[in-house]
Amino acid sequence: MTTIHTLGFPRMGAQRELKFALEKRWRGEISADGLEAVGRELRARHWALQREAGLDFVTVGDFAFYDHVANHIQLLGCEPARFGFAGQEPELARYFTMARGAAGEAPACGCGQIHGADASGKPALEMTKWFDTNYHYLVPEFTPETGFHLASERLFDEAAEARALGHPVKAVLVGPLTFLWLGKEKAERLAAHACPLPGPLPRGEGEIPFDRLALLEKLLPVYCEILVRLKGAGVEWVQMDEPILGLDLPAAWKKSFEGAYWRLASTGAKLLLATYFAALEENLRMACQLPVAGLHVDAVRVPQELIGAADWLPAHKVLSVGIVDGRNVWRTDPDAALAALRPVYEKRAGNLWLAPSCSLLHVPVSLEAETGLDEELKSWLAFAVEKLGELSMLKHALAEGEASVAVELAAARAALASRRSSPRVRNPRVAERLAGLPADADRRASPFAVRQAVQRARFNLPRFPATTIGSFPQTAEIRAARAAFRRGETGEEEYRCRMRAEIAVAVKKQEELGLDVLVHGEPERNDMVEYFGEQLAGFVFTRNGWVQSYGSRCVKPPVIYGDVSRPAAMTVEWTAYAQSLTARPMKGMLTGPVTILQWSFVRDDQPRADTALQIALAIRDEVADLERAGIGIIQIDEPAIREGLPLRRAQWQAYLAWATRAFRVSASGVADGTQIHTHMCYSEFNDILPEIAAMDADVITIETSRSDMELLRGFGDFNYPNEIGPGVYDIHSPRVPAVDEMVRLLEKAAAVIPAGNLWVNPDCGLKTRGWPETEAALANMVEAARRVRMSIV
């Protein structure tokens, strides 16, 4: 009989219960035990949902209070030494210190860092994208001295929880090669260094280079110990996630798989090697030959490899087919799925497993709460719970015939037919505009050097101009005002007055702090993508379709179901009002077409490039309206531009061609004196710098503080021609950076980028921070800018 399972399940809960519990814990409103109780309740509920859907195993090890990679850092005993843990701190406290950093009161010394016995500020672990998704993981830090040991009982406790509830258990681990790949080599501290800095040194300042793959021999015994423990606890199967098999791996990493998995196989554990997100290509045959009990392949992203996997995987091994899309919300086409599965089922019915393509972490929990969606559109969708139901339907259709699930199949087919024929999906006017787009619609009128001179004459900004990325703290009062307006409890005029008052507060605070280019603070915006999607045709919004971005941060991606257009101006009123309150330049704040695309659930019935260009034209219209309203600086955020890169380098150029063109189309309809900014975060750009330069933004701001300006070196080596604002402090941590710390970062930046082209700004928007820490950090940032204006020629 075919087995069905899931690679993972959403953690936050249907009502974001984990988010609210985490934030209460961080505010000191509940105890650690209270948070653990919420975790137990959510795990029990999610396991019950899996069993109710007919899954043969529940998955254990996918739950995390912040991030599953951070769970592994503790499980494997490799918490970075720079945090200075003495061994007495509670495990959960150490976990959150790694994730969020720790503030301190000790003064800074001449080294430019805060440190000392009083608990210096401890910057959080770097955070970056999980492959090409919108989920963020915490980056492990490795040095040659990094050791590993089994240091947490959490995984085993959760397996015991599930078994005590009567569930058959499949555990999931990030595989050893992927765990090492996800980390970074960090600097060794020179023993003679007089000042023990709280963060890693950049290369060249005391670092002894090494390859983290060299740590594999120290790591494997701990994995073996974990597998032995799980087997002894009655866990029959362990899913080993090795998605790096879909990457362009160096030869040494490929070669390491065979030896590593022979070591792991010696434990006697049944291992399911799980791959997803990309084609295995040359790694497929090797994956089929590894000494594991089964292999999972992503048949949604890579349907062409399914038959190869079925042919090459030995008949006695399990083939797990990711046949339901774990990353998007559209209902599965049962006829296409069954057509793909039947040849495989005929070959290996007893050793065929069905699953989502990847963990369901990337989709909302359930459609049950979506009472606001019209029934036609709702019928086109499937969230995590519904996707489990689709697996059950496919299992029974294969094993017992379609008649056994005739009702379910009929409903799925009717929904698909409705979507294909619905007039709401296609807009002839959008098609006409795309067809008539001029060839030069993606080019500014003049080159950057000409524009820069015009803009400098217009704005007369000081060197190292200080600004922010866009959003300011979203207080409980702001959120309550928006919620009351959405519920119809307050009228439109009252709401507008309240938002204007918040904008006025933000403008006043920025002027008092001494910022040079201001923003309106975005109090009216719930999310940088959702806000725009709500005002664009072709989008629909869920009531409770939340997915985890990082930690407690959840986003509610819009669903792009049809052609995109802009019925009316979206931001002009708020930005123009903010500009009326100050003589300083006010930035218009927009989200770029690629980011809107990447952070939405995108229609799958046309190429993503076509949808991106539709969005670009809508943003272009908004840029033109802002310019007409007198807004001279317009920021078009594209934090997701690198996230969209295919995982295989051979496919990069095609993606970058349409992605950068979409940005240029959105930004190029303005005069030379209008300054276009863009912002990118969580990104490493060195391998795509020509394409970043080709976007031709007048100013780019990027996240660099967590990497100690490491990301900026590539811009300097490339001689990046335009202006750049490297983030000088990490907004994801409540820690307030010292002035000297930011001065040091700016001095490092000025060593690789011409000082006249540098801006001063935080890493990202300040929406998730509180006002006291925001004002303190920005005051220090402005002072840092003042100092470097005086010290750097």
Protein language model regions, located:
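A cross-taxon signal for low-complexity, glycine/charged-rich
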Residues: 197, 202-207
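Domain-level signal for soluble alpha/beta catalytic cores
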Residues: 1-193, 208-793
